[in-house]
Amino acid sequence: MNWMDIRIGQGYDVHALVEGRKLILGGVEIPHTRGLLGHSDADALLHAITDALFGAAGLGDIGRHFPDTDPAFAGADSRVLLREAVRRVHKAGYAVGNVDATVIAQKPKLAPHVPGMVANLAEDLGIAPERCNVKAKTNEKLGFEGKEEGIVAQAVVLIYRAEAAEQD
C-alpha cells in the first residue's frame, strides 16, 4: 500500500438541545432532561462520522445522501445511516481504517457512556474497538455548548483502498 491508497475525511455536526427529545450520541441513549433537535434521531456524533466517511471517499456529504427534506429519514436511526454510509464507502473501493471523534457538551457528563459509543462504532464500522476513539469534552462554560444550548461533534476518519489492503 502506498500513501495514494490512504484518504482522510473530517466531519462536523451540531444540534440544539431541546425539551421533549431523547439524547442519543454514538447510538447510546443518555439520560438527560433534554435531547438534540433534528430531522432524524439527531445523533451528532454519528452524523459527524458519517460526514467524514463520505468526505474521505469523495462522495459528498451526509445531506446529499440522507437529506433532511426527505420524509424517509424523519426520525431515522443514525446507526442505520452510518452502516449505509460504510456500505457506500466499501462500494467506492475503500475500507475503514480508524475513527477519532470528539463530542463537546457541557452537560451531561458523557465519559461514562463512551465505552458504549465505541462498541457501537466498532460494530457499525466493521472495525476493532481499538480503532475507534471517542473523546468527551466540555467547553468550559463558553459558547453555546458551554451555555448548554447545543452539542457539537467532530470526527476524523482514515480510509484506505480495499484492493491495496488485499495485496499486502
UniProtKB/Swiss-Prot annotation:
Its EC number is 4.6.1.12. GO terms for molecular function: 2-C-methyl-D-erythritol 2,4-cyclodiphosphate synthase activity; metal ion binding. Its cofactor is a divalent metal cation. It catalyses: 4-CDP-2-C-methyl-D-erythritol 2-phosphate = 2-C-methyl-D-erythritol 2,4-cyclic diphosphate + CMP. Binds 1 divalent metal cation per subunit. Keywords: Isoprene biosynthesis, Lyase, Metal-binding. 4-CDP-2-C-methyl-D-erythritol 2-phosphate binds at residues 13-15, 39-40, 61-63, 66-70, 144, 147. Pathway: Isoprenoid biosynthesis; isopentenyl diphosphate biosynthesis via DXP pathway; isopentenyl diphosphate from 1-deoxy-D-xylulose 5-phosphate: step 4/6. The record marks 39, 138 as: Transition state stabilizer. It is an enzyme of class 4 (lyase). A divalent metal cation binds at residues 13, 15, 47. PROSITE patterns: ISPF. It comes from the Bacteria. One of its GO terms (biological process) is terpenoid biosynthetic process. SUPFAM superfamilies: IpsF-like (SSF69765). PANTHER family: 2-C-METHYL-D-ERYTHRITOL 2,4-CYCLODIPHOSPHATE SYNTHASE, CHLOROPLASTIC. Involved in the biosynthesis of isopentenyl diphosphate (IPP) and dimethylallyl diphosphate (DMAPP), two major building blocks of isoprenoid compounds. Catalyzes the conversion of 4-diphosphocytidyl-2-C-methyl-D-erythritol 2-phosphate (CDP-ME2P) to 2-C-methyl-D-erythritol 2,4-cyclodiphosphate (ME-CPP) with a corresponding release of cytidine 5-monophosphate (CMP). Homotrimer. Belongs to the IspF family. This is 2-C-methyl-D-erythritol 2,4-cyclodiphosphate synthase. It comes from Ralstonia pickettii (strain 12J). The lineage of its organism: Bacteria, Pseudomonadati, Pseudomonadota, Betaproteobacteria, Burkholderiales.
